[in-house]
């Protein structure tokens, strides 16, 4: 869409929802928050350390956002992802999707989160409460210094 907006951000700062400016053609806004659970592999954790291959992660996030705009006719997609340590109960991912109709907004949000988990090189390592041992190496999951990647 010619007037669509795509915003992607990797940050070590706590996530906040952007302002609520809504396009007059939008009929639906879906906000998704990915929250760090208090357990991993059945054990209590203090939180998760996220790391990323920054340049590749930025590239993949931009690509996913652009694909979502085209595939679901979105007016807006915002993807903010944390890196660094994220405590249990804090958000590691914020995504806002805006479209003319709710069905597209929900589908786009689900699709974009699934694509992010499959394609974006962001890795997690749980910090366990009892023994502070890292999770199994190589486990790949999601939900990233504040750095606005793109907006346009």
Question: What does each model-identified segment do?
Answer:
Residues 1-91, 98-152:
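N-terminal, polar/charged subdomain of small-to-medium soluble alpha/beta proteins
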């Amino acid at each position: 869409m010619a007037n669509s907006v795509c915003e992607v951000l990797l940050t070590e700062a706590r996530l906040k929802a952007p302002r609520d400016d809504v396009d007059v053609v939008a009929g639906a806004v879906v906000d998704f928050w990915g929250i760090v659970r208090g357990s991993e592999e059945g054990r209590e954790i203090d939180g998760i350390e996220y790391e990323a291959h920054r340049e590749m992660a930025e590239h993949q996030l931009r690509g996913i956002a652009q694909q979502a705009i085209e595939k679901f006719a979105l007016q807006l997609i915002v993807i903010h992802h944390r890196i660094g340590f994220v405590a249990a109960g804090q958000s590691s991912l914020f995504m806002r999707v805006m479209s003319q109709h709710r069905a597209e907004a929900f589908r786009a949000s689900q699709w974009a989160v699934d694509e992010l988990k499959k394609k974006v090189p962001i890795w997690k390592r749980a910090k366990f409460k009892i023994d502070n041992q890292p999770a199994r190496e190589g486990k790949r999951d999601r939900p990233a210094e504040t750095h606005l990647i793109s907006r346009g």
